[in-house]
Amino acid sequence: MYKEGVYFSDITRHHEDSGYKVKAISRLLFPILSLQKIPVDSYADVGCGSGGVTKAMKEQLKVSGFRTKKIEGFDISPHVAQLKEEAIVFKMADFTTEGELMDLFTLTNVLEHITEPVNFIAGIAHKAKIIAFHIPLDDCLNVHFRNLQRAKIKDPGHLIFLNTNSALNLITQSGLKILDYDYSFETLSAPSNNETNLQKIAFPVKLLISKISPCLLAKIFGFSLVVIAKNEILNDLGQAS
């Protein structure tokens, strides 16, 4: 589906949600970078898709005062050859085998498409100082009750179904240290979450539950999780130098 270019036959797929995802990531990421005085001279977006997150994060780094010299977007789908943006290099490549050491990585809505997520994260982790994840939580009552697993496997190609604990466990098992996590409140308003009449009717209910207990919302309707993690070895080496 991905390597053949079928998934991104429309190269703008999910582009409209990119800004919401970056806002959610930035809320956790930039206070950590500032507090720990972590420079971001290089940044890679793994599984860059339409390139929307890569572009939005480039702008966010700039307005936050980072002078990021090297920015790359990686995807195994051939559509990346059509993506163009000043100061960003888009590559059709598997980052786990071809990527270089980077200060910052983002993986937005990627893990659910991977059959061996621990090995995949570990393959990236040894090249990363900081990794920011945005992870859909599809292991919820809404999916179970409506028997949506089959449909999600077919499109959008979700191969595993995660909840809050299993997502955090995958990241820890990959050898990374979790610095912070929170639910992606910003993406409740994203276009893809407000397309159908049913979604529009459910929106105020979701919003109310999210204010009372985001964990409960994740268990009932599903949600997305933002996780910021670091490679302690690379960060220690950077501080020593």
What name fits each language-model region?
Residues L83-E86, N142-N147, A190-E195:
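Short aromatic-enriched loop/helix-cap "lid" or pocket-rim segments at secondary-structure transitions
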Residues G123-K127, H134:
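Conserved helix-to-beta-strand junction in the class I
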Residues M1-M102, T108, V118-G123, Y181-S184, ...:
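Conserved N-terminal segment of class I S-adenosyl-L-methionine
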Residues H134-H158:
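Short, glycine-/aromatic-enriched active-site segment of Class I SAM-dependent methyltransferases
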Residues L179-K206:
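Conserved catalytic loop of SAM-dependent methyltransferase domains
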Residues T108-L111, H134:
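Residues lining the SAM
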Residues H113-E116:
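Di-metal (Zn2+ and/or Mg2+/Mn2+) metal-binding site signature of metallo-dependent hydrolases
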Residues L159-G175:
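Short alpha-helix
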